[in-house]
Amino acid sequence: MDKSIDFYTKLFELKLVSRREIPQNNAEIAFLRDSEAKGSTLELTFYRNQKKFIQADYEDRVFDHLAFEVKDIEKTIAAMRKEKVTITDEPFKLSATGPMIAFVEDPDGTLIELIQRT
């Protein structure tokens, strides 16, 4: 949990607004909010006994990735390289008139899409 909080607060400038234990679920949650207070909140959940909480109706669900809009994708990628973040796809133009995008992984291997609008 600490690595994930550090990743999102340092590289995406999210602010930790709450962190607490959920004893009945043997879990911990943290809420991170956009530093510009645009209303976006990211909830991180760490289950200490993950297998206990996998339910049949969730097995068919597939989570692909998160996406964050960044002002300068090259600057963001450079900062991530300094922090030894895994860069999955270097910045590239999605189409002739589309945004620049790149993909990285968070400390838990979650795929993160970076988008720089043109």
In which residue ranges do the predicted regions lie?
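Unchanged
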Residues: 42-45, 53-56
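Vicinal oxygen chelate
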Residues: 1-2, 49-51, 58-111
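Core segments of cupin and vicinal oxygen chelate
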Residues: 1-39, 82
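Acetyl-CoA-dependent GNAT
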Residues: 46-49, 117
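Active-site beta-strand termini and strand-to-loop segments that position acidic
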Residues: 32-37, 104-107, 117
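Short glycine-/small-residue motifs
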Residues: 41, 111-114
